Design a protein with these regions (language model features):
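Basic, low-complexity intrinsically disordered segments
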Residues: 1-306
């Protein structure tokens, strides 16, 4: 009998929190999602406590079922057992170390709940905040396995909160939407696909990129050369030369992009900007070519057509 009284006390607190959510949502449309997240955190905590703690909560949902039956009748039909389980899972996710959780909406968190890796969750939370991602944008990034396409070194840096370089943020492979009926494409076709979705391409490279131009003309002696794509990164304060290759990376590709980088450094960059970065987007990487390249500011990443 005593246990039942305690459970009902928790139930009344949970009910009041959820009623607050429903009332608030009718008058504070602009901020209701964040308010909902905060209230659901409180509800999740009370559910765990009512079940006797996290360990005991793993072995049964009888109490949640009882709560759900009453809440559906007394508050709103959306508070069924599935929703209450999500709310409980949300609380546990925060307890495991999800950061800055109060800055996202409940709609965002519903997409993150199926993820078990807390480092992956924090990665997506951070990019949602930094890039002001919609729920649709977040779903797309999760679907494209953006976190999985980071290097292990970058994942370790993120987990230990070390400083991240521009090159750490580059995904491998870069995902590019293909409008053609074939996966065998020319460099011209590859460039067209990228320019059709330049914002998506820059997001694949990381944060802070701005588009300057394509076929950027430079003059080497009496001969004109053309940089495939020239970008600028405002976060890292440097120009970024992008060269596209539909073959495996070759040593001459390194030499070519280094010439372009040196030109930008000498003729375009100011003394207040950092040295130019070079990114080669190739069909296949060659780790030995990169390994023995003398320039640490050159990186190669592969592309994948989807």
């Amino acid at each position: 009998m005593k246990g039942l009284i305690i459970d009902m006390n928790y139930y009344e607190e949970i009910k009041n929190e959820l009623i607050d959510v429903e009332v608030y949502n009718t008058v504070k449309e602009y901020s209701k999602n964040r308010y909902t997240s905060e209230k659901y955190y409180n509800v999740g905590k009370m559910i765990i406590e009512a079940q006797g703690g996290e360990e005991r909560a793993k072995y049964g949902d009888g109490l949640i079922k009882e709560y759900a039956v009453k809440l559906v009748k007394e508050v709103d039909k959306k508070y069924d057992i599935t929703t209450l389980k999500r709310i409980r899972q949300f609380y546990l996710m925060i307890q495991k170390g999800a950061t800055m959780w109060h800055q996202l909406s409940w709609s965002h968190y519903r997409e993150l709940l199926p993820i078990n890796n807390i480092n992956m969750i924090n990665y997506y939370i951070n990019i949602c905040i930094n890039q002001s991602l919609s729920v649709r944008d977040l779903k797309e990034k999760i679907k494209n396995k953006e976190y999985d396409r980071l290097t292990n070194e970058t994942k370790l840096k993120l987990a230990t909160k070390e400083d991240i370089t521009l090159m750490d943020n580059i995904k491998n492979p870069i995902v590019i939407k293909n409008k053609y009926d074939t996966n065998i494409i020319s460099e011209k076709m590859l460039k067209e696909l990228i320019l059709d979705n330049i914002e998506t391409f820059m997001n694949e490279l990381g944060e802070g990129f701005c588009y300057i131009g394509n076929e950027y003309k430079i003059k080497l002696g009496v001969v004109y050369n053309y940089i495939d794509i020239l970008l600028y990164n405002i976060k890292y304060n440097c120009y970024v030369v992008v060269e596209l290759k539909v073959t495996e990376l070759k040593k001459e590709h390194i030499g070519q992009i280094q010439v372009y980088m040196n030109y930008i450094d000498e003729n375009v960059k100011t003394i207040y900007q950092d040295k130019t970065i070079g990114i080669i987007v190739a069909k296949h990487n060659n780790k030995y070519v990169i390994r023995y390249s003398s320039n640490p500011k050159v990186v190669c990443t592969e592309f994948e057509l989807v």
